[in-house]
Design a protein with these regions (language model features):
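Extracellular hydrolytic enzyme modules, especially secreted metalloproteases
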Residues: 139-305
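Zn2+-dependent metallopeptidase catalytic core
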Residues: 17-183
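N-terminal Sec signal peptide cleavage junction
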Residues: 10-12
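A residue-level signal for beta-strand positions that form part of recognition/binding surfaces
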Residues: 46-48, 131, 216-217, 294, ...
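Non-catalytic C-terminal accessory/binding modules of secreted extracellular proteins
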Residues: 19-32, 41, 55, 61-63, ...
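Short, polar loop/linker segments at the starts of domains and inter-domain junctions
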Residues: 62-79, 229-243, 309-311, 329-332
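Short, Φ-rich (hydrophobic/aromatic) sequence segments
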Residues: 87-89, 245-250, 351
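Bacterial N-terminal signal peptides
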Residues: 1-8
């Protein structure tokens, strides 16, 4: 049978598991890490947008050698970010809303780097600002990263960006004049994901070293996948169920854990992860797969921000908890496009998709899972 999560009274916004089983130890760690960052994923999140002016003859090799510079002001960038607000309200089911305001420009010298852009903007931010978004007015080189984001250090009460160093940084590429006012926003959404303490997902077995940003299922992987297929798209894909849970956008009743204390064979109905939370039902299943890792099984609908996908599909990811923050988690694609009749098996676990169906927009699936009893010594 499937065991729903049992919880005690909330502490710092996150409940504590009381199953008493080592099966869910890694999931407990995710909750503890999320608690350490306070309420940054809930409610209105004030961000200050700052333009960083880069000298023409900068020594920072991340920038493309060019005389061309972005013409937008921080106020104009704030206007461009309006769809980003809608993106996060949509995927948080109204539980989270970034609030962007224009900050004072900063300038670096020709011997300073893009890191100094963020540090200078953080140092000047006010106590009410919980995150700083810095946009350089110069483009990055074609082989360089587009941006970066960090949740900063944990906090419980005073969570000002000046204290936590929570920030997002991006080069000018997505805000240059050649976009004619229609900027792609997936990079910004990806970096805000990092500032919400979300890690990358990838098909590689480890998130250390070189990574492939190759999963079209997750804004934290191939964030440009939608517009690569549909040129008018500007948002990234949605994100994985485990990120939504860590952010407290999924509740405990949306998660079920498969009991590995004995042999189990069960059928589970899944609702697509984008279905409104007013409709009750399981959004994802967790199956322990080692001391610090587990599998997640979820149903992703091919619509909205995921309209680039061929069809609704069941996806399996291996989540490995590492380090002391969520961005250290390893989230590896196991299966990304399971359809009717598809099966996966490994480590005493087998998963079969019995059917995927759509009824009046409610995309749902039935899966059958068999799990052998975990042997402990």
């Amino acid at each position: 049978m499937l065991l729903a999560l049992l919880f005690v009274a909330p502490s710092c916004g996150r409940s504590s598991l009381t199953l008493g089983a080592t099966d869910v130890e890694a999931l407990i760690k995710i909750g503890i890490i999320a608690d350490s960052y306070g309420e940054m994923t809930l409610g209105v999140d004030p961000w200050e947008v700052v333009v960083c002016h880069i000298p023409i003859f900068t020594s920072d090799e991340i920038f493309e050698p060019s005389l061309e510079r972005m013409s937008l002001s921080s106020r104009e960038i704030v206007k461009r970010l309006s769809p980003v607000v809608s993106y996060f309200k949509r995927h948080s089911y109204g539980r989270y809303q970034p609030l962007f305001s224009a900050g004072q420009d900063v300038t670096i010298s020709d011997t300073e780097t893009s890191d100094d852009c963020a540090e200078r903007a953080l140092d000047q931010s006010g106590p009410e600002v919980r995150g700083v978004m810095v946009v350089a007015d110069a483009e990055h080189g074609a082989d360089e990263f587009g941006g970066r984001g960090t949740p900063g250090v944990g906090c419980s009460e005073s969570c000002s960006a000046r204290d936590t160093r929570r920030s997002v940084y991006a080069g000018a590429g997505d805000f240059m004049d050649y976009w004619n006012g229609d900027s792609p926003l997936d990079l910004v959404e990806h970096e805000i994901g990092h500032a919400l303490d979300w890690p990358h997902s990838t098909t590689l077995a480890s998130n250390s070293g070189l990574e492939l940003y190759d999963s079209p299922l997750d804004v934290m992987s191939d964030s440009s996948a939608p517009r690569m297929l549909i040129s008018t798209k500007r948002h990234g894909p949605g994100t994985l169920a485990i990120n939504l849970y860590a952010a407290r956008w999924f509740d405990d009743e949306h998660l079920q854990i498969l009991d590995r204390s004995r042999r189990v064979n069960t059928k589970v109905q899944l609702l697509a992860t984008d279905i409104d939370l007013s409709i009750m039902g399981t959004r994802f299943v967790v199956i322990a797969d080692g001391a610090n890792s587990f599998l997640t099984v979820e149903l992703i609908a091919a619509r909205g921000d995921n309209a680039h996908l061929n069809s609704a599909a069941v996806a399996i990811h291996r989540i490995t908890v590492a380090g002391t923050s969520g961005v250290d988690r390893q989230q590896t694609v196991v299966e990304k496009d399971m359809q009717d009749g598809d099966k996966w098996a490994g480590n005493g676990i087998s998963i079969e998709v019995l059917f995927i169906d759509s009824d009046d927009g409610d995309v749902k699936a039935e899966i059958e899972m068999t799990v052998k009893k975990t042997v402990t010594s």
